[in-house]
């Protein structure tokens, strides 16, 4: 899904604002007293190994190779590293994540030994969700196919960072993982095993919700673009937001005080009417220019001949400026720069 960006390299070699994901991870993890870092490699694995050997000889890093990475999924990759999980307490992290330092601090400093980091659902999130109770017990893992928008307010997204104790791995997780692979095959996800464990009353795994800490999962070029904005330097972030000219729903925590909005529009009545007619609006083909001009004239009380309906102000501005002006023209200058651009 990342196309040319991963044509010759694995995902963790992607750069976000000039820093590779693997470099960021290793810098973050090197602050802690870890016995070792274990990396499961597959696609273009030797390039990653060579890069790490050349740059991180001072860190104890071991590698596990998945030679059939193109025929298996992450459940098999994790199974290959099962001996490491059973030998020590483990932090499990996926390589396509970018997180701020505080998230790892929060995980390691928590007194619970077995944790799954989760984040309250936001619209940009995709993939496996969970439900949790007031005691942070995971009640249910919800795969992507089982997602229900009407229940989204109850969901938390798995961040795909976990803390497993040696006891949990050896006595609960790995035995179930091995059995799951035998029954379901190797082209599955390791979270499905965690889903089975939630059915057991005595599992020690708990969820740990994060707060406003920044994180992002990079699966495609749009994710990379958004992550580059979120994790940019303070001095550059405003310009990166500004050049988007909108679409700020992709940044739920961003408050935009400059965009030309009317806090009284649309009102509740209009929202309810749109919701009630949504299926018709979505499935039916819209009317042409003639009908739209007629309706606009009707609602504004003017002749149809005096109305031109366009797809937003930018479309009409272009026509007016190029074809219907002579000499000097004076215009207002809105904050989102649609006239000069």
Task: Give the predicted meaning of each segment.
Residues 35-36, 59-60, 88, 303-307, ...:
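Short acidic capping loops at alpha-helix termini that bridge into adjacent secondary structure
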Residues 56-128:
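Conserved beta-loop-beta/alpha segment of the NTase-like Rossmann-fold superfamily
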């Amino acid at each position: 899904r990342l196309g040319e960006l991963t044509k010759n390299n694995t995902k963790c070699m992607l750069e976000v604002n000039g820093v590779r994901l693997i470099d960021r991870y290793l810098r973050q993890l090197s602050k802690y007293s870890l016995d070792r870092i274990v990396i499961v490699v597959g696609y273009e694995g030797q390039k990653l190994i060579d890069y790490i050997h050349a740059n991180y000889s001072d860190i104890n890093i071991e590698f596990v190779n998945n030679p059939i990475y193109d025929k298996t999924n992450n459940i098999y990759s994790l199974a290959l590293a099962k001996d490491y999980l059973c030998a020590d307490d483990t932090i499990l992290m996926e390589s396509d994540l970018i997180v701020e330092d505080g998230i790892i601090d929060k995980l390691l400093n928590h007194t619970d030994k077995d944790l799954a980091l989760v984040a309250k659902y936001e619209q940009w999130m995709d993939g496996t969700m969970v439900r949790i109770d007031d005691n942070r017990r995971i009640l249910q893992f919800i795969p992507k196919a089982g997602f229900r928008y009407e229940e989204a307010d109850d969901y938390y997204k798995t961040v795909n960072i976990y803390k497993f104790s040696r006891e949990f791995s050896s006595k609960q997780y790995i035995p179930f993982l091995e059995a799951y692979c035998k029954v379901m095959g190797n082209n599955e996800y390791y979270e499905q095993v965690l889903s089975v464990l939630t059915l057991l009353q005595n599992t020690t795994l708990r969820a740990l919700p994060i707060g406003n800490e920044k994180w992002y999962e990079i699966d495609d070029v749009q994710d990379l673009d958004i992550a580059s904005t979120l994790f940019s330097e303070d001095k550059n972030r405003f310009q990166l937001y500004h050049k988007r000219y909108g679409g700020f729903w992709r940044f739920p925590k961003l408050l935009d005080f400059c965009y030309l909005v009317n806090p009284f529009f649309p009102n509740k009545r209009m929202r309810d009417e749109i919701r009630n007619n949504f299926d018709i609006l979505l499935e039916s083909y819209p009317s042409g220019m003639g009908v739209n001009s007629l309706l606009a004239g009707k609602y504004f009380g003017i002749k149809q001949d005096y109305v031109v309906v366009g797809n937003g102000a930018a479309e009409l501005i272009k026509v007016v400026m190029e074809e219907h002006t002579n000499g000097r023209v004076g215009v207002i200058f809105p904050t989102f720069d649609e006239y000069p651009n």
